[in-house]
Amino acid sequence: MRHLLDFQGWSRTEVESLLDTARVMREVLERPIKKVPALQGFTVATVFFEPSTRTRISFELAARRMSADVVSFAAQTSSLQKGESYKDTLLTLEAMGVDAYVIRADSAGVPHQATRWVKGAVINGGDGRRAHPTQALLDAYTLLEALGTLEGKKVAIVGDILHSRVARSGAELLSLLGAQVFCAGPPSLLPQSLPGAHLTPRLEEALEEADAVMVLRLQKERMEAGLVHLEDYVARYQVTEKRLALAKPQAPLLHPGPMNRDVELEGTLADSARSLVNRQVQNGVAVRMAVLYHLLVGREKA
């Protein structure tokens, strides 16, 4: 693969190969010395036109664990504030010898455009509400650890589905790996359609006999219309101990973060043994190591 923008055109075999590499990288991270020279001599730029904590730090750590040089770009302190375009920003980084670009933007399509501007590998770190492929990969990896397989498993995704790039990429990838994906939320926060998923305004339908549950926050920063009343949302859609009892016993809980405790998820559940939130973060580094390795070393071998 030359870039990672979304999962259009991906085969199940390609995804499984990438996740196999992530398992190797997970073993590296469990060593006393958590570093290998696999990307020595390469330069990775994290280009975030939108704020991020987990994705940016995770990618930077992943690159450093493989001995790559890392350039961290922050829009707030860049020449974007002086009117420079995304294109000219990326061309400047290319002139400095960057090999891979992890790009996040609040507008959909920016990573796709970047592939026409620069020669290096482009990784979508999240673009608007469209896609977040590495989050989907780390979620799939975490679920495979917990469940053994996704074939025939029911995965419930609950929350603000309409504005969620995590839901879009997650439904696409999990269904590709054989899961049955049910997305539940208020009618005003459900899209008209979502490839790979069954949409329902009934939380109980999504949770019933679910093998795993992923909870999403309300993305108020993306809401132009359809803003729900917080108290009403909590009353009808918060994942609580009582509601989670509809799922299979010990069904794991996931959350991509950032989490609003006691809004989308009951606080006690966030800290329970069923919560895999911290495991998701740990696995995110390994998965992103695998992505960088496939893109950079794979290119060199091609």
Swiss-Prot record:
UniProtKB keywords: Pyrimidine biosynthesis, Transferase
- SUPFAM superfamilies xrefs: Aspartate/ornithine carbamoyltransferase
Its recorded name reads Aspartate carbamoyltransferase catalytic subunit
One GO term in the molecular function aspect is: aspartate carbamoyltransferase activity
Instruction: Tell whether Mitochondrion is among the UniProt keywords.
Output: no
One Pfam family in the UniProt entry: OTCace_N
GO biological process terms, alphabetically, are: 'de novo' pyrimidine nucleobase biosynthetic process; 'de novo' UMP biosynthetic process; amino acid metabolic process
Could you say which protein family the record assigns here? Answer: Belongs to the aspartate/ornithine carbamoyltransferase superfamily. ATCase family.
Q: Which PROSITE patterns match?
A: CARBAMOYLTRANSFERASE
Q: Which organism is it from?
A: Thermus thermophilus (strain ATCC 27634 / DSM 579 / HB8)
* Pathways involved: Pyrimidine metabolism; UMP biosynthesis via de novo pathway; (S)-dihydroorotate from bicarbonate: step 2/3
Record: residues binding carbamoyl phosphate: 54-55, 104, 132, 135, 257-258
CC annotations in GO: cytosol
Residues binding L-aspartate: 82, 165, 217
Reactions it catalyzes: carbamoyl phosphate + L-aspartate = N-carbamoyl-L-aspartate + phosphate + H(+)
- In the UniProt record, the signal sequence range is none
